[in-house]
């Protein structure tokens, strides 16, 4: 058995934590009092259940495990408190014996007349020792699917493997059975021939033997080069070994990413045009993206102009569509970041470079381990629960999308070593305490108040003028990705699509270049500014101004909670039309109640009393110890 609590696999702690979370308040506090004596820290952990919806038992054990608590201490404490069910779950676990998966080999040839790839190094060593070599080949369309050998960690449908790697598919009625599994990527044929296979000589010639002058970027697992074939530019991703990678990792990664790329066909997913598994290297071939990555454009690298808001919102909408499409195929990208959102000549986003993860069926395979120094740069886009627990779920992609949305909204890099805090996610999540203390957070939700704080402090000023309520809608979408554990991508995408539709309609009436690009609020366009914080008003106050609104504007499609955005956007459009067609609307005399000044301490007490009546706050937190 593991010596320390932090050495227990995360899936082992899942059941005990759920069991402990279901205890009564008295029993749980009795257990917690033996673990932690600092009441302030205990209250902080307890509040995480209400604010962030996390397991308080897991947070407690994490805190205890970081102080070198042992598994024996945990089991003894559970037995002393007669919590035998949780103790037995831990005692029943035994470390599974380490199983070494055989390294999949590549075919000696993919065409009878031209060899393409060699077997892996391990297979060569076994052959020298006289041991039989098991070759995993890619059968043709006429081969039986059962003969295709797939890696143990990747189990796509059996008919996908043979039909994904060949383009000469039969046109008979028998092919109808494969209509849902045959990737549509096969229509994107490379110029090297009528197949996705590229020979080693073709790749070497196109890249000038991977000349350093052609290198575009260098990543953790691959280097990216630019090359030409028949006058057409291509991008070549050359996989490479890392210092801490295991033997055969390139081959496994190559096969996994190849299978996933060939299953995807979406306008916002970067298509694969070919691949090469040569003796000296493994490479993927992609179309060349003229506008680089979203990260480059946001940071203005190469002297590029700042992206205006309509294009920024359109890129965000395309990214969310791509991730939603992958999740529909049960594929977890797990590498969503602004540097992997590539832009073509029309600034259409293309999500690239997945880490090749299929949604696993086995519960234990949902957890992953990652080397620290490989993981540092990606940590800026990963949620805290994944960093602690290592459980790979779709929420990892959704959280990463929230960080990209925040980068687009604020123009702040996801990671900056010269900034405190270093990660943008920590900067945004630090707004939660002040947001929860706001008097309107109980009515409009923590995400909405948090979004207002983010817009007031960090909204990008150099991309032109963005209406306040559109900015808050985008910030709310980002906050939903960052905070909610069961966020619906459809809900987030609906909000972003509503803003995109409104900006597109406004751009048709007034070109975006005619708006002020130097400030976030233009002095040429009137704004509804009051001396009070408008965030304290709920949606009903927004509807009350509709009777005196000016010319009607087309309402945006309502989908998944977009009603608030539709009313707000109408107010913004009507207020801009007021500058040309008429005087300001009359003020409602019933709205003067905001002038009543309430003592801040009294207001806080009134809020706590309401929470106490709703059983969301106990007496200790209400009156203090």
Curated annotation (Swiss-Prot):
GO terms for molecular function: ATP binding; protein kinase activity. Transmembrane segments: none annotated. GO terms for biological process: cellular response to lipopolysaccharide; interleukin-1-mediated signaling pathway; intracellular signal transduction; Toll signaling pathway. Residues 13-94 form the Death domain. The modification Phosphoserine is found at residue 144. GO terms for cellular component: cytoplasm; nucleus; plasma membrane. Pfam families: Death, Pkinase. It comes from the Eukaryota. Keywords: ATP-binding, Nucleotide-binding, Phosphoprotein. Residues 169-181, 516-526 have a biased composition (Polar residues). Disulfide bonds: none annotated. Residues 210-503 form the Protein kinase domain. Residues 111-181, 513-539 are annotated as: Disordered. InterPro entries: DEATH-like_dom_sf, Death_dom, Death_IRAK2, Kinase-like_dom_sf, Prot_kinase_dom. Binds to the IL-1 type I receptor following IL-1 engagement, triggering intracellular signaling cascades leading to transcriptional up-regulation and mRNA stabilization. Belongs to the protein kinase superfamily. TKL Ser/Thr protein kinase family. Pelle subfamily. Interacts with MYD88. IL-1 stimulation leads to the formation of a signaling complex which dissociates from the IL-1 receptor following the binding of PELI1. This is Interleukin-1 receptor-associated kinase-like 2. It comes from Pongo abelii (Sumatran orangutan).
């Amino acid at each position: 058995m593991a010596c320390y609590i932090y050495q227990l696999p995360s899936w082992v702690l899942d059941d005990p934590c759920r069991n402990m979370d279901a205890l009564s308040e008295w029993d749980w506090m009795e257990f917690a009092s033996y673990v932690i004596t600092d009441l302030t820290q205990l209250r902080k952990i307890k509040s995480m259940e209400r604010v962030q919806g996390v397991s308080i038992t897991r947070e407690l054990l994490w805190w205890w495990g970081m102080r070198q608590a042992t598994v024996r201490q945990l089991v003894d404490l559970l037995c002393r408190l007669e919590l035998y069910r949780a103790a037995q779950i831990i005692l029943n676990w035994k470390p599974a014996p380490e199983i070494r998966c055989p390294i999949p080999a590549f075919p000696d040839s993919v065409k009878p007349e031209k060899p393409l790839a060699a077997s892996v190094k391990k297979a060569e060593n076994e052959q020298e020792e006289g041991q039989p070599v098991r070759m995993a080949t890619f059968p043709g369309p006429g081969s039986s699917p059962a003969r295709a050998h797939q890696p143990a960690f990747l189990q796509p449908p059996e008919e996908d493997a043979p039909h994904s790697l060949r383009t000469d598919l039969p046109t008979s009625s028998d092919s109808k059975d494969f209509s849902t599994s045959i990737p549509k990527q096969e229509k994107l044929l490379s110029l090297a021939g009528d197949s996705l296979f590229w020979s080693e000589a073709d790749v070497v010639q196109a890249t000038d033997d991977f000349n350093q002058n052609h290198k575009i970027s260098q990543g953790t697992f691959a280097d990216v080069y630019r090359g030409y074939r028949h006058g057409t530019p291509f991008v070549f991703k050359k996989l490479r070994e890392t210092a801490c990678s295991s033997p055969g990792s390139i081959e496994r990664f190559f096969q996994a990413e190849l299978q996933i790329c060939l299953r995807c066909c979406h306008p916002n997913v970067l298509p694969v045009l070919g691949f090469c598994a040569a003796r000296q290297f493994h490479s993927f071939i992609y179309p060349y993206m003229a506008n680089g990555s979203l990260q480059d454009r946001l940071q203005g690298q190469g002297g590029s102009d700042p992206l205006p808001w309509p294009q920024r919102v359109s890129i965000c909408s395309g990214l969310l569509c791509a991730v939603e499409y992958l999740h529909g195929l049960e594929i977890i990208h797990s590498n969503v970041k602004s540097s992997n959102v590539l832009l073509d000549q029309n600034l259409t986003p293309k999500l690239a470079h997945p880490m090749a993860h299929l949604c696993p069926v086995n519960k234990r395979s949902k957890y992953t381990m990652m080397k620290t120094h490989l993981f540092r740069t990606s940590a800026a886009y990963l949620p805290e629960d994944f960093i602690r627990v290592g459980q790979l779920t779709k929420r990892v992609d959704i959280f990463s999308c929230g960080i990209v949305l925040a980068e687009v909204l604020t123009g702040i890099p996801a990671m900056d070593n010269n900034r405190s805090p270093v990660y943008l996610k920590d900067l945004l999540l630090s707004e939660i305490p002040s947001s929860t203390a706001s008097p309107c957070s109980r009515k409009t939700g923590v995400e909405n108040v948090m979004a207002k704080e983010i817009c007031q402090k960090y909204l990008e000023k150099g991309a032109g003028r963005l209406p306040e309520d559109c900015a808050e809608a985008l910030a709310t979408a980002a906050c939903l990705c960052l905070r909610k554990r069961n966020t619906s991508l459809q809900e987030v995408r609906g909000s972003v699509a509503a803003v995109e539709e409104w900006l597109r309609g406004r751009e048709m009436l007034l070109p975006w270049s005619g708006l002020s690009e130097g400030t976030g609020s233009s002095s040429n366009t009137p704004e509804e500014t009051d001396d009070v914080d408008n965030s304290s008003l709920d949606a009903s106050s927004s509807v009350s101004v509709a009777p005196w609104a000016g010319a009607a504007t087309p309402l945006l499609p309502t989908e998944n909670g977009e009603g608030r955005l539709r009313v707000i956007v109408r107010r913004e459009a009507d207020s801009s039309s007021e500058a040309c067609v008429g005087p300001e609307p009359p003020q409602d005399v019933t709205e003067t109640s905001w002038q009543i000044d309430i003592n801040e301490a009294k207001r806080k007490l009134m809020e706590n009393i309401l929470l106490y009546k709703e059983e969301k706050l106990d007496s200790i937190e209400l009156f203090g110890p």
